UniProtKB/Swiss-Prot annotation:
It is found in: Cell inner membrane. Residues 1-10, 75-77, 139-140, 211-214, 264-280 are cytoplasmic. Residues 32-53, 99-117, 162-189, 236-242 are periplasmic. It is a multi-pass membrane protein. Belongs to the binding-protein-dependent transport system permease family. MalFG subfamily. This is Inner membrane ABC transporter permease protein YcjP. One of its GO terms (cellular component) is plasma membrane.
Amino acid sequence: MATNKRTLSRIGFYCGLALFLIITLFPFFVMLMTSFKGAKEAISLHPTLLPQQWTLEHYVDIFNPMIFPFVDYFRNSLVVSVVSSVVAVFLGILGAYALSRLRFKGRMTINASFYTVYMFSGILLVVPLFKIITALGIYDTEMALIITMVTQTLPTAVFMLKSYFDTIPDEIEEAAMMDGLNRLQIIFRITVPLAMSGLISVFVYCFMVAWNDYLFASIFLSSASNFTLPVGLNALFSTPDYIWGRMMAASLVTALPVVIMYALSERFIKSGLTAGGVKG
């Protein structure tokens, strides 16, 4: 009787999981199929799930700079995402280590402030950031967006990295100090390598936030040559002669870097999240 209950429970679980996957993946499947349909077939009054005539014209179009400067937008997004992520992780290492290892006045207040940040929406920072960026004279530049993305991701980076550093035994660093290493040497020779899975997790998080950002990019960038992919895609959607297949192709190619990055770093992300959630 107990075996039958377990079997039924397992069947129900896998059926529910299959239904969830179908609901989740079906829109992406439709996007993929639409990207292979011709312009007229994509808006047909009698749509089909699979293309009647397969075509790669939309993928060719998005890489044609005369039609859509996808490569330029991709480069801008890549520069902003990589640079802001590297800066956020580097500063996060220093801040997280200080909160995890050093004892100083106001430490708990600073630590609590990182929790408080999560209570506020990012849009509340638009006005102060806009004033700072215009005062610095970097409006409509990649640097403006890099600074904004670091501002957005740094609190989370510090919060997550502190959890990882808390799992590293103090005895390891004490032994290193006895061998003559200073604080910076300990951080980059011992602490950082031991927390590498956590660093990769934080980098992927920061990269995804910067790569997918539309709000700040649409406010701080005005020249088409500086657009990132989210803003560029919105411009593509706003054209009067929009072509659904081209939009779906551009959207899918835009999502590929994040998907590939997550797939390659999945093992590190899982181990990093596990390590960061356990104290000891």
